[in-house]
Amino acid sequence: MEHIFLNLKRFDIPSSLGGVNSIAPPAKWAEYIISSVKGELAAMSADAEFTIFFPEAHIIEAAAAGKEGWLLGCQGVHRFDVAPGGNFGAFTTGRTAKSMAALGCDYTIIGHCEERRDLGEIISEGGGTDLNAVNRILNQEVLRAREAGLK
């Protein structure tokens, strides 16, 4: 079976704000994407597994559209997660793997170039020089994703 991944990055930002979106209002963007491709994806589903990775603002809308012929992916997860008797979930700006799984995600992206660059810049800004720390942090994300059942 083939695996096809579509990462939509931040293509939802309207062109009037400097983005590239001219196809639908941001609140209806995921719905537009899915309605535009789901017929073709259903026809291909016997030969290929197709995953669409949406920006976090569109995960709920995408999951609600119904995953017929496609899987849902998020664009990253935090290196820590909630646990019974542990952290109760105060991850204000972080997407935990369990939260993404609970919303219906099947896959996540870990270690894309923007994330690697951002982590490296944070380490350097703090005076650090061990950029292998980026790989160690990303490994924590991989572990959290697997624990949550994400691929």
What are these regions (language model features)?
Residues 1-74, 79-85:
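Conserved N-terminal beta1-alpha1 strand-loop-helix module at the mouth
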Residues 25-31, 88-102:
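Short, acidic/polar
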Residues 49-53, 81-82, 89, 127-136:
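Active-site glycine- and acidic-residue-rich loops that bind
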Residues 55, 100, 112:
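Conserved, mostly hydrophobic/aromatic
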Residues 60-64, 95-103, 141-145:
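Short amphipathic alpha-helices and their capping/turn segments at secondary-structure boundaries
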Residues 106:
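Receiver (REC) domain switch/active-site residues of two-component response regulators
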Residues 114-151:
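Conserved anion-binding
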